[in-house]
């Protein structure tokens, strides 16, 4: 049974374009299925999480596997708190749809290209994909998701109080997402499920890729404690099994902490309805202070030891060159764009041209971006 402060699909604020409900799925389940059927969702399997799959190996996480892992964590947490697991799962599945090829490196490169044209943000791009760029229905652009899902995608990291992305502001005029308030508890869960998944699994993939080793992990005292206890209990544990056990324990402890602190917050604030969650002065779903410190420490470790390692910097330089090279060549000659993209440009106006090109590049997979660069630019990048 859903809590009184949960997002109830029967009480959804609805869709921008009215539709007849289905009897065999609730509204959030319907949205989940629509997201899974999008082209953007399928393309995530060929987009980088940290390591470029076709270069580094087939077993590293990509944006699709990451999104699935986030969704499983979000669903479990929401279920335990008597919230809508369908909504939490749906937001989690959609949270990275707007990512460029080559992960955050690609996003940074594209944002630099777009600095004169209001920049680029993968979060805002997710909204644009789901409300405009996906063309699957005759009656409207996008996939016509419920208000609660769109709110969660835009605001899962918190209220938008500063500068508002151009497309978000434009969309908000026709479908007010209440940008200055917190999103639902389910959306907040999706956000922290993302943190849980990416720090634990980036550690795992980095060990497997030999970017870091167990000596490096000793820099994180709590991880070093895990290692000591596991080696004491399992004398002959293999390195591969050791990292899996570490990650399993880390995920379990993070989820447990999140549940306990969130229950405490709900009790302390005497929350009785969803509007109280939205209008609260802080995020109701959270970790304890100690665990937040551990998470921040782990993020700093990953940046220092992994994302800013010599190997990753070398890859980043090449990926940046590909994204920025493609942007420049399309800006110089729009006839190189596919016809269905070229016709979206408003009379060859520079701003419109840049936005369409950014949308096109953002939708590319790693592999397609490399192929396009090889075909249109020199020298060739047969490998990253």
Curated annotation (Swiss-Prot):
- Name this polypeptide is given: Deoxyguanosinetriphosphate triphosphohydrolase-like protein
List the InterPro entries hit by this protein, alphabetically: dGTPase, dGTPase-like, dNTPase_2, HD/PDEase_dom, HD_domain, PHydrolase_assoc_dom
Q: Name one GO molecular function term.
A: dGTPase activity
Query: What CDD domains does the record tag this protein with?
Result: HDc
Q: A GO BP term, please?
A: dGTP catabolic process
| Species annotation | Rickettsia typhi (strain ATCC VR-144 / Wilmington)
Disulfide bond sites: none
Name the PANTHER family for this protein: DEOXYGUANOSINETRIPHOSPHATE TRIPHOSPHOHYDROLASE-LIKE PROTEIN, DEOXYNUCLEOSIDE TRIPHOSPHATE TRIPHOSPHOHYDROLASE
- Keyword Transferase listed: no
Q: Which family does it belong to?
A: Belongs to the dGTPase family. Type 2 subfamily.
Q: Name one Pfam family in it.
A: HD
Which keywords label this protein? Hydrolase
Domain of life per record: Bacteria
Residues in HD domain copies: 63-199
Q: Does the keyword Hydrolase apply?
A: yes
